[in-house]
Every structure is written in C-alpha cells, then in structure tokens.
Swiss-Prot record:
InterPro entries: CemA. One of its GO terms (biological process) is potassium ion transport. It is found in: Plastid, Chloroplast inner membrane. This is Potassium/proton antiporter CemA. The gene is cemA. The keyword Transport applies.
Length: 229
C-alpha cells in the first residue's frame, strides 16, 4: 500500500515532465502537413520584422557579390550576362524555398508551444488535487535529506544557474527558445538577456536564503556558507 502511494506522485511527476514533449511530438506530426499546405496554397503575405528584412537584404547582396567574384576569377574575363542572371535566379529561388521552410517551421513550433501551454494550464487547473499530492511528496522527500546534501544540492544548482560558466548555458538556452518561437536572432537582445537573467536569479536566491532558510533551517545556512567558502 505504501509503495502504491509512493508510485502515484512519481507517475504524476513523470507525466508533468514528459507531457509537454509528448504533446509537442504529436502536434508536430499532425499539424506539419496541414500548416505546409495552408502556407503554400493561401500565398500568405510575408510578415517580416525590421531585423529579418535587413537580414534577407544582406543575404541577397552577399549572393550577388559572390556571383560577381566567381565571374571575375574565371579563366576568361568576359562575363556571360545571361548565365550570370540565370545563376542569380536559381540561387534566389533556392533562398526563397529555404525562407519558406523556415516560416513554416516557425508557425508549426509556435502552434505546438501554444497548444502545450493550454493543455498544461488545463492540467494545473483541473488537477489541483494531484499537484497538491505531488507537492507534499516533494516536500517530504526534501525533508528527509540531510542538511549536508541539501547544502550541496543548492550549491550545485546555483553554480549551474548563476556561476562563472553559466552565461554560456544561458546563451544556448535563450537562443533555443528564441529560435523555437520564431524570433529573429538579435545579438544585442540576446546579450542583454544573458547578462540580466543570472543577476536576477542571484538576487532572488540571496533573498530566499535571508528570508526563508534562516528561519526554517539555520544549520543548513551555516553548512551552505561553509561549503561555499
């Protein structure tokens, strides 16, 4: 009976962790064909922000410069204008196809993320009892750990999130989220987020130690500072 009670929170925890991934996988399979047909048949007006438009223009200019350079370094100095235009036309079509696939990918991932968020919100609203049981199970599990293990876990987590090497991990994670939601890569915004998030988390963590841990478990705070020093 005790094993069954312990298995239920574990099952709920596993479902919460893997449910978004399963939803995203199923939605990708079912929506990909529909979104591709919708995008290609409706001939939707291209929606670009200033950053994306600037990036596309820069790629077109680079493409033209590469073809001109290719003609200049050929054995014969005469440039075949018709062949040059044909090459530009083929590369332009290929570039448009790549951009079209990128737009479809953006819409697909945005749709799956939105559906996953709605389903998880509904799960958190209608499954309050399961979440309460899961919360009690997590608190009991943490309570049974020794103060040394708790302090070591807190130190490991903080070093991963706000440590010396954490900006590279934040850059990868924020860049992945940016790409997943279809936002254009903008170095200044990405650098601002990477430099801001660890500082905010560090402030929240120090405030949490000061307000909560000092009151609940002073010995844990002492061990944490001893390990940290």
């Amino acid at each position: 009976m005790a094993k069954k009670k312990a298995f239920i929170p574990f099952f709920d925890f596993t479902s919460i962790v893997f449910l978004p991934w399963l939803i995203s996988l199923c939605c990708n399979k079912s929506l990909k064909t529909w979104i591709t047909n919708w995008w290609n048949t409706r001939q939707c007006e291209t929606f670009l922000n200033d950053i994306q438009e600037k990036s596309i223009l820069e790629k077109f200019i680079q493409l033209e410069e590469l073809f001109q350079l290719d003609e200049m370094i050929k054995e014969y100095p005469e440039t075949d204008l018709q062949q040059f235009r044909l090459g530009i036309h083929k590369e332009t079509i290929q570039f448009i196809k790549i951009h079209n696939e990128y737009r479809i990918h953006t819409i697909l991932h945005f749709s799956t993320n939105l559906i996953s968020f709605v389903i998880l919100s509904g799960y958190s609203f209608w499954g309050k009892e399961k979440l309460f049981i899961l919360n009690s199970w997590v608190q009991e599990f943490l309570y049974n750990l020794s103060d040394t293990i708790k302090a070591f876990s807190i130190l490991l987590l903080t070093d991963l999130c706000i440590g010396f090497h954490s900006p590279h991990g934040w850059e990868l994670m924020i860049g992945y989220i940016y790409k997943d939601f279809g936002f254009a890569h903008y170095e200044q915004i990405l650098s601002g987020l990477v430099s801001t998030f660890p500082v905010i988390l560090d402030t929240i963590f120090k405030y949490w130690i000061f307000r909560y841990l000092n009151r609940v478990s002073p010995s844990l705070v002492v061990i944490y500072h001893a390990i940290n020093d």
